[in-house]
Amino acid sequence: MAKKNDSLGNRMKGYESVSRHFLTRRMPAIIRLDGKAFHTFTKGMKKPFDPIMTQAMQSTMKYLCENIQGCVLGYTQSDEITLVLTDYATLQTDAWFGNNIQKMVSVSASMATLAFNQAFSAISAEWINQQIHQFPTMGTETTREVHTYIVKRNTALFDSR
């Protein structure tokens, strides 16, 4: 039973510590991030490697390698990213989140989600802009109307191949 003067935060940390697990220090840690339902997400994309998807995954991996402490190697294939982390570059090197598995997994997944969404959005927007500039501007009235609409609304477009 918690004492009356315990703060809510301290009690919650106590509950969390029961299931807290740590990796062994001074050993490489491998994090594998796998896309959820990417078979549905990639429906309609070029097989086997859509250039927009590939570029977004590479950009995501690069972001993770640059922003996760101790990351020495990143590898991406399909909808998976593998990262190798070390905490033995020097004797004073600390492990990312003290090798707390729950923290490493949850934060790396959220970082990957953020980076992928930003990269995919930017790369898709660039592709859409390229398509708009290839769209014929001369010709029928309908063609001109479609072009005008796309140019004015291009921030709301999404590559739905």
PLM features: residue spans?
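Regulatory and interdomain segments flanking nucleotide-handling catalytic cores
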Residues: 1-161
